């Protein structure tokens, strides 16, 4: 694997979406508009709540982001499912970062709680992912807990985010 670092900028994340960051066969992030972060500010295999890995990432909020026009006209708010998807994206990125190969797929989440919202007046969303378990055998899978903060205030909590990497997704 190439380009294993402890942080990544927007250009790096765009390279990942094209399969050019870690190399052939490693999981890719989605391309814009579904790429839900602008930078990853910290990657660690040993830190975090469970000592199994920590990911911190950020999304800059501007009123012209695509989802504010359609969700909802006259009452713009970032869809909660996009924050959830961002957490799955980051778990998949972590799996590639630790050497896992395959195509990333979200497998589920145990529990999600929304206690706030992301409005066009916000400045920054922060994602915090605490890895609980990584399986890197024939099956590559990550299990994590995550939090979404807007301008420093926690607004979503997800428990047991699951992502798998698959060599063949035709039967998925």
UniProtKB/Swiss-Prot annotation:
| Pfam families found in the cross-reference section | FabA
Does the keyword Isomerase belong to this entry? yes
Read off the InterPro entries from this record.
FabA, FabA_FabZ, HotDog_dom_sf
GO BP field: unsaturated fatty acid biosynthetic process
SUPFAM superfamilies with a match to the protein in the record = Thioesterase/thiol ester dehydrase-isomerase
Q: What is one GO cellular-component annotation here?
A: cytoplasm
- What EC number(s) would the UniProt record show? 4.2.1.59, 5.3.3.14
What reaction gets catalysed by this protein?
a (3R)-hydroxyacyl-[ACP] = a (2E)-enoyl-[ACP] + H2O; (3R)-hydroxydecanoyl-[ACP] = (2E)-decenoyl-[ACP] + H2O; (2E)-decenoyl-[ACP] = (3Z)-decenoyl-[ACP]
Q: Which UniProt keywords apply?
A: Cytoplasm, Fatty acid biosynthesis, Fatty acid metabolism, Isomerase, Lipid biosynthesis, Lipid metabolism, Lyase
Annotated metabolic or biological route of this protein: Lipid metabolism; fatty acid biosynthesis
One GO molecular-function entry: trans-2-decenoyl-acyl-carrier-protein isomerase activity
Q: Where in the cell is it found?
A: Cytoplasm
**Active site at which residues?**
71
**In its keyword annotation, does this UniProt entry include Lyase?**
yes
Query: Listed disulfide bonds for this chain?
Result: none
Q: Which HAMAP family match?
A: FabA
Q: How does it assemble?
A: Homodimer.
Record-stated family? Belongs to the thioester dehydratase family. FabA subfamily.
Its biological purpose: Necessary for the introduction of cis unsaturation into fatty acids. Catalyzes the dehydration of (3R)-3-hydroxydecanoyl-ACP to E-(2)-decenoyl-ACP and then its isomerization to Z-(3)-decenoyl-ACP. Can catalyze the dehydratase reaction for beta-hydroxyacyl-ACPs with saturated chain lengths up to 16:0, being most active on intermediate chain length.
Protein name as catalogued: 3-hydroxydecanoyl-[acyl-carrier-protein] dehydratase
The UniProt gene name for this protein comes to fabA
